[in-house]
C-alpha cells in the first residue's frame, strides 16, 4: 500500500483524506497488538512545547521512546531564547530543524504550526495544538477509540458537550467524523460557547445531520458516543458559569437510559463536568482513550518518518 503520509506535515485534520485516516488507524491497531521498539531507531525528534501540556507531551514522548527514537526539546516556552531574548518563532524552528528529523510543536497562537512548517526546511511538523484552532493527533486517538469501541466510524450518533466554541478537540473531531458516511451530531453547550458557524456550515454543505440540544438527558438514549469537554470558568460570567456547571454535568443517574454500546469520551483534563461515580460505569472510556494516544501517535510518527511499511 502506498504511504501518502510520508514526509507530510500533520497540521490540521482537514489535511488528511479519509484513506489516510484509515491508514493511521490500521497502523495504530497493529502497534497496539505488536510493539515495534526499533521502528524509528536513529531518528531524533524535537518536542517544542511553548504552552503547558501534560497528557499530549507525555504521550508523544512515550510514543517516541517506544519506537526507539531519541527526543530533544523543551516543555516550558518561558525559558527559551524566543521569550528571553526576543527570538522569533520562525528563527527558532529554522535552527531546531537543522538538528532533528521532525518537530512536534504546541503553541498558543492559532496558525503557528502551519507557520512553523514554512520554516522547518522540509522537516515534518506535528501540530500538538495551536490555540483554539486544531489538535489533529488528539483526533486520531479519538477516532481510534471510537473505532475500537463501536467497530465502525460510520452511522454513528455523536453528542458533543461543553465548550464547543473554543475547544479545538471538538472542531477537529467533527471535521474528521464528517469524512465518514451517515454520522449524526448532537451539540450541547451554553449559548455563549456554541459550535462555530464554520463547523455548522461545513456540515450543512455536506448535508450531514446536526442539531443543538439543551441538555444531555434529551438525547442520551439515542447516542453511541458522548464526547464531554470542560467548560472553562474564564469563558463565562459568574451567573452563566454557575448555570452551565449544573446543566452540563454528567451524572451516573443520567445514564440509566443509555444504549449498551454507548461510550463516554473526554480529551481531559476532567474538572467537575463528569461526576466521579460515572467512572465506575461500563460507559466510562476516557482513561482508556488517553492510553490510546500512545498508539495513535506512534502510528502517525512512523508513517510520516518511514516510507515503506509492512
Swiss-Prot record:
Entry annotated with the keyword RNA-binding: no
GO terms of biological process kind: 'de novo' pyrimidine nucleobase biosynthetic process; 'de novo' UMP biosynthetic process; amino acid metabolic process
Positions bound to L-aspartate: 85, 168, 230
Coiled coil regions in record: none
Reaction(s) catalysed (UniProt annotation): carbamoyl phosphate + L-aspartate = N-carbamoyl-L-aspartate + phosphate + H(+)
Transferase as UniProt keyword: yes
Gene3D superfamilies assigned to the protein according to its UniProt record, in alphabetical order: Aspartate/ornithine carbamoyltransferase
Record-linked InterPro entries: Asp/Orn_carbamoyltranf_P-bd, Asp/Orn_carbamoylTrfase, Asp/Orn_carbamoylTrfase_sf, Asp_carbamoyltransf, Asp_carbamoyltransf_Asp/Orn-bd
Function per UniProt: Catalyzes the condensation of carbamoyl phosphate and aspartate to form carbamoyl aspartate and inorganic phosphate, the committed step in the de novo pyrimidine nucleotide biosynthesis pathway.
Protein name, per record: Aspartate carbamoyltransferase catalytic subunit
